[in-house]
């Protein structure tokens, strides 16, 4: 159906738009040759999440999931590579990457060699990916509480909030059409947290930029 192609295209475009938000951090790292004020953990967790969903899409034969997540994993790996290049704590960050790769390899061996039934493999992998995605969407809640206390949204990105809302909404619809709760359920928190952010922007709008008047 044509509308299904449109929905798949929307999922791809919105999700890649959300993933590309890290390009601003990449430009800062390259321009300043520094990783100051840039967090590394979101790149790593998003990369692992992308790889998990890519494998799920591969087992299910879902091209939309595969396209989105292979590009997403490539972008996150690019961000991590730049971070490793300019980080003064290169050894510590590198050790985290190696540990994560080890966990990823163990997970792959578990799902591939231990669970032989395809349906069981899909169910267990889908559950794992869903829980991981939900935890990522809910992790900024502490930051949102801090914003309420400080009554300032300076640390929030409005374009990223819009991208997250559109991405989560499109994947919820996609999961409903596919009758796949492992896709539908974990994206509901993304909608909820985005709506909370919109409310915060309405309650505590960012300060307008100030301009110095030119003296004649």
Swiss-Prot record:
Annotated organism of origin: Xenopus laevis (African clawed frog)
TM helices/strands, residue ranges: 3-23, 36-56, 65-85, 96-116, 125-145, 157-177, 181-201
Family per record: Belongs to the SWEET sugar transporter family.
GO CC, alphabetical: Golgi membrane; membrane; plasma membrane
Keywords tagged on the record: Cell membrane, Golgi apparatus, Membrane, Repeat, Sugar transport, Transmembrane, Transmembrane helix, Transport
Function of the molecule: Mediates sugar transport across membranes.
Annotated GO biological process: carbohydrate transport
Name of the protein in its database record: Sugar transporter SWEET1
Membrane topology: Multi-pass membrane protein
PANTHER family with a match to the protein in the record: RAG1-ACTIVATING PROTEIN 1, SUGAR TRANSPORTER SWEET1
Pfam families found in the cross-reference section: MtN3_slv
Subcellular location: Golgi apparatus membrane; Cell membrane
GO MF annotation list: sugar transmembrane transporter activity
Record domain MtN3/slv: where: 6-90, 124-206
